[in-house]
UniProtKB/Swiss-Prot annotation:
Source species: Shewanella sediminis (strain HAW-EB3)
UniProt-recorded name of the protein: Glucose-6-phosphate isomerase
Protein encoded by which gene: pgi
Positions of the catalytic residues: 351 (proton donor), 382, 510
GO cellular component: cytosol
Places the protein is found: Cytoplasm
Amino acid sequence: MTELTQGKAWKTLEAHTQALPHMRALFEADTKRFDNMSTSACGLFLDYSKNRANKETMSLLFSVAEDAQLESKIKAMFNGEMINTTEKRAVLHTALRAKPEQEIMLNGVNIVQEVQETQQQMELFVDAVSSGNWKGYTGKKITDIVSIGIGGSFLGPKIVSQALRPYWSKQLNCHFVANVDASSIVEKLKPLNAETTLFIMSSKSFGTQETLTNTLSAKDWFIEQGGSQADVAKHFVAVTSNVEKATEFGIDADNIFPMWDWVGGRYSLWSAIGLPIALLVGMDNFRALLSGANEMDQHFANTPLSENMPVIMGLFSLLYGNFHDAQSHVVLTYDHYLRGLPAYFQQLDMESNGKSVTLDGTEVDHSTGPVIWGGEGTNGQHAYHQLLHQGTALIPADFIMPLQSHNPLGEHHVQLASNCFGQTQALMQGRSYEEALKELAGSKLPADEKSVIAKHKVMQGNKPSNTILMDKLTPTTLGALIALYEHRTFVQGAIWQINSFDQWGVELGKTLGNDVLDRLSAENDATELDCSSNGLINMFRQKKI
């Protein structure tokens, strides 16, 4: 048994959750519930009133956080302590969006200064490309960026660029490549002109298998299209720690942007990994993105637990996973530009908190990270929302929507909002058997058939959700929103006493993948692995079923 689950607050909360009435009753008992259970910070508004909680629940949740010494753990992260214990690293992605005047010391060095120097390097590069001063090997301006990465060096820049589409420069387009499947890069390159294409290779080691394979294929394509090895420097830049390998590839040392070991991949979009974002929206908007995240950092670091937005959201996720057996959490974005966020939050949360031992190696005796999934409203309402309303699993939901649209066309946004708010109400309220039967009162069906149909139309309700609103989707509010989910993820991991900043499952997959790669090109049939793996390898080598 872990210390966490034996704590008084945990055990009291366990008993308390079983006695809470339906949310309908909670709303009837408190006409000011919306006011009492909502908060604002950093341009975001959070309505958490549609959760299975009352004042006592909140008090117990905060007690669980206090028992886990959450506040001291938050300070430890911001102070640069080695909280990534398995890799003996500090966790300082927050330094990437620090204000220039802030001082964050690590090993006697103010790393904010290093970050600022990198941002200045980025700005010079962005200005050169955007102005047309940076030219390809035939003297033409760059029109297309191909960003090659994997994991955090791919998903973060892609999703943020997608979200900030209204702020894109008219001079540039960007294409993102991650999957090692050749079809991905081949289709991306088909319409492009090598003379006007710039490649950004993002890999800390300059050796990540998928990224290096795609980059080598991009280089081959570039030379096949008329470029030369000598021209590579005009068309390839890198974000990496391995300067030697990058220069061997042909990249000019001046066009290599640094990475640091105190930033994990899934937290790296704020660094030079975000170069594609900066190229598309400009450095002013990129800095606004950083500013919004920094504002959320300050809120998280300095606000009491009871008013702290990431803490509140993290505690609710813990509540449902550990006390209501919720195995997944759905993120529903009611904004087309935010359609990629569920996938980004999926990586952030599941790679961080998909762990089964505590910091000291003890096996946990409770659930940890849930499955994060979701999609774009209103599309999901005609698909998986059915399961949310009437399925047997409890699936907490986050609804995210800007109050103003970038495209105020007719009644579109009003209808979007009505669907968003209507879904949260339906999940909370449900429909009783009596209500369903009453709706059928005017039909000519026999009484026994009405009864059966009414049972099919019953929805239990009491399905929890948060609603996050912002005035408008801007670089600043987007930065705050992403940082909110980063810190929400931290809160859960800190209370569970797991390491949210390593990813040994990912590393094992890489190792075994490389081992299989060698066997796929061997002369003899595979016999050394399990019979299933041997069979699959041999079948692939024969290229037929």
